[in-house]
């Protein structure tokens, strides 16, 4: 290896220089160094000429080992990049070696080498022979010229095959080289090399089978690979047959059969025909006539089945050959008895089985079976006539005297066809031997003794010696009973009367048995003779019966023959179909396996390609870096050389050696170059300036000289143009004149034909008029017929349309009658329900009157006690204290003296925080105002009456009350963003027992007289109330407003809420002007109920959701719950919502009686039907409403919640934040998880009352609070405390002012807790109300229809920041818009901002903390 590295281009140049001076070895060394170098492992275009030159030198110098190393290195270089280059190089190498060998052979007179093995040219025998014998010049020349080149060529073939083995990319080249190697062996008669070549190919094939997982491995299942291997093996078989190497030929046959076994598809017929042809030759050469004939049989059948274009001549030739080969099979068995006994290990049997396997046979063939097959497949009819009778003479006819004469004619004809049919000549000796044996067998059956000369005369083509040999072989092998008497020259047959050693049936023509056979079969013959005798003497009736049975059998066969034939044909067809199906399944399986293997190989190939691509990329990157370095150095060198060529550079770089580039400073070189460039640039600028000045002066002088010349040329051009125009104009005029003269001449000539033209046209029209008239008449008839047909069709269609319209109208009328009937039934049911509700209400009012009377008496006694205590206190304190007391509000005083009870002192209400009920959930955004009440004087009395009503434990009244409302737990206004519903789904919060909207007023408060049943109650006002006159029952102005309200006028019945709807309307509840809830849903809509403004539950579930559609009366899911179902007691007196309102209740009229908000939804209500029996939106929320699951006796959701429960959200705690409580049988889908953001959870510190647990009584009796049997004695504090102890967390008995401020603190804490919770994104359906929003319904059970409208307005106008998800708000809003007749006014706080809808939109962008503000009445409003 040289000490320095050379580039490939330089190495090739260097090698060429060595070759020019005749130094091949140094040139080879230079190229060898480049090829072995590890720095150029990436293939380049220069590698191919280097490799060709390298191999050329190897061939010239006969360096086969160097050629081998170079080829292996080149294979590694270009295998993944350019495999075609490797193929070209290998082919060029072998071609070059063959050419040199051919030239050496031409120079030598020795055509065939005497050397047996080229690998061992100098054997000990050859050395001794050369030493003792003389060697002439020619022999020495042959040995020096031809032998080395033949050896080199053989080594080249072997090395190339080793190089290319088991590589799918060069598989074609591998097989081409193998076939060339076989030709080489055949050309130079190299038997030893042929054997080695066959062994190498066999080893390569086994390696392919072992290393099939390599990336470039050959897939033997590939049809192309199999065909190439078979082609190579057939060439090997041909070469072995040509070289008469029968052992190698037999091995080649086994290799071919092994390749057939590897292939799952059958080989091509042409290939099999060639295979059988070659195998038959091998069998015949090996002396195995039996398998030779069997192979020809297979070839004959294959040709008949597969070859479509088989000519009669070819069929005749093949049939003749098959016949002769079959008859040439020796009659003598291959093995004698002794050989059969000596074959202990079954070697011969195994050999026969292997040979049969090579032909695809299940068992070894025999001579008799082949003859039968030949006859069965009718091969004799295609045999030539001259040979056709040979079969009958040898195998059928018994004529020993003429046998040899006949056979001799056939054999003579075969010998005459030596030129046309050379393959038939080989059968003549075997046919003669078989003829001799047949003659001996037939003679033995006729003669007992015959002379030897007589027998020789019968066999003219056999001499005496061969005849005697044939007789001895027949006696030994064929069990022929013959004895030769040499003294008398005779032959004796059948003289041995012993038992026969074999019981083989006679083969060939048969006349009679031998004497030994008679003796051996005497008993059998006797039995046969007796049977014949019995048959002869059998009576006639037995024969007749037998004949009749025979006829019956024949008739039965004739009857069933067609059916049986059809069954056999069907069975054959079934077998064929099954074969085809199995073949298709095998093909499909093979295809799938092939695809799977291809996929796996593709994966492996892709992985290998990716790896090689990465390696090639890295090598390419390294090569590019090296090239860049070289280019850089080359550029620097060239630049220095250029600089040194200049005058200045030669001086500047005179002492610098260009070869020492690494020692030079790049900055120094660059500075020198820049300096030189600047100098040259300045010189160039000077030259350019001088040139510019020179060109400028020259151009100016030229233009001054050319001005007069241009003027002169212009004048000349103008004159010539004028002359040309005049000439062209004259020519045009003359041409026009000539054309006009010709036109006039044509006109005159054609005018003479005008009369003839007119006469011809008139005659033509006259002749065609009749045809026109006939066609016109025919058209008119067709037109009339078509009109008639179309009119009839139109008439028929109209009749059909009228009939269809009649039936359709009839069906619609029937449907309308059915609907009217259903509507009437629904109205009747509603009427019955209304009457029942009215009866219950009257009963309730009567009971309420009694309770009020009892409460009034109790209150009078309490007031008397208080007055006495007050007097005692005044007497003790004296006149100063009594004077001070006049300014101090009394705890038991009337409303004017207590801001806590008082209706509204604006100053005091601004100062004092509003007292919050512990059941209101701490919702500061929904304060209660006195302005919505008819006077706070009634609240005290009402609360006391409610307490008495709750305390009397009347379960019957509770059941009647709760039966009218089965909506689930009662909710306060703060809970679900809307008023609760009562009997008639009327909105309005109802005051519970412990409603903290102010203490209930006593009888002595200056509220004005209590209203009776029929009063059209204006507001009961205190002395200092400045709210304006209270509205009566008939006023339709909406809720009253105080003097300090600036909310705008209340809307009355006729305000623009849209027309009210009747019973048959299906529009859904009315909506306000700015409502964005979408259109109201009708009866047939299946969208699910609407959702409220601030719901964040996601869309309400529709009818197709998994909790099932809302049920109506006509649904087949079971009856809807009715009045008397066990869904839990209806809410009554002991319900925690407070007593129902009566007629004389002073909290505002109940809806439906004298309510000025429009009549209750009933029969004459034109606001759309209530959600009733057939309403598919789900039943309405009323006393029969089941939009939430009705609470049954077994409902485990805990006690129902009313207005007197204090809760931050409608749902509280871990179990109450999941949406509506569900009954045991509900199928509305999964409950909402605790993590859903539907309001604050119910904390341990919340004082809403006890949570319901599993241990609470959920039996058949309605749940009711624990109340003592008698009312609490003492003042209202004691009663309040008793109620708090029974209903919820106890309140400390502080004065009202202190409790207000403590509640304000609690509110602040809860507000801060709400602020810490994430602000929900307010969607359009959760926004609050504004000026045009229709007010919610107020249930009559809440008794605050007109008294508390403004608090509800304020609550709706200012919802909380984190409003709990209210799953029933949307429904309540819909129902209250249906049933509320009076539009609600907007709160005063709402006029200060456009609407809280817009604030909701703004809160999406910037959520803000709620701010509490108090108005002049002392009510707190949440501003955000």
Curated annotation (Swiss-Prot):
InterPro entries (UniProt xref): EIF3A (IPR027512), eIF3a_PCI_TPR-like (IPR054711), PCI_dom (IPR000717)
Gene3D superfamilies listed in its UniProt record: 1.25.40.860, UVR domain
Keyword field contains Membrane: no
Compositional bias (Basic and acidic residues): 868-919, 939-1259, 1276-1412
GO cellular component term, pick one: multi-eIF complex
Disordered: annotated segments: 821-849, 868-1424
Protein biosynthesis in keyword set: yes
Sequence repeat windows: 994-1003, 1004-1013, 1014-1023, 1024-1033, 1034-1043, 1044-1053, 1054-1063, 1064-1073, 1074-1083, 1084-1093, 1094-1103, 1104-1113, 1114-1123, 1124-1132, 1134-1143, 1144-1153, 1154-1163, 1164-1173, 1174-1183, 1184-1193, 1194-1203, 1204-1213, 1215-1224, 1225-1234, 1235-1244, 1245-1254
Region (26 X 10 AA approximate tandem repeats of [DE]-[DE]-[DE]-R-[GTV]-[PS]-R-R-G-[AFGLM]): 994-1254
Any matching Pfam family: PCI
Keyword terms, alphabetized: Cytoplasm, Initiation factor, Protein biosynthesis, Repeat, RNA-binding
GO molecular function terms listed in the Swiss-Prot or TrEMBL record: mRNA binding; translation initiation factor activity
Cellular localization per UniProt: Cytoplasm
Record GO biological process: formation of cytoplasmic translation initiation complex; translation reinitiation
Subunit-structure text: Component of the eukaryotic translation initiation factor 3 (eIF-3) complex, which is composed of 13 subunits: eif3a, eif3b, eif3c, eif3d, eif3e, eif3f, eif3g, eif3h, eif3i, eif3j, eif3k, eif3l and eif3m.
PANTHER family referenced in this protein's UniProt entry, alphabetically: EUKARYOTIC TRANSLATION INITIATION FACTOR 3 SUBUNIT A, EUKARYOTIC TRANSLATION INITIATION FACTOR 3, THETA SUBUNIT
General function of this protein: RNA-binding component of the eukaryotic translation initiation factor 3 (eIF-3) complex, which is involved in protein synthesis of a specialized repertoire of mRNAs and, together with other initiation factors, stimulates binding of mRNA and methionyl-tRNAi to the 40S ribosome. The eIF-3 complex specifically targets and initiates translation of a subset of mRNAs involved in cell proliferation.
HAMAP family from the UniProt entry: eIF3a
Protein name, as recorded: Eukaryotic translation initiation factor 3 subunit A
Organism: Xenopus laevis
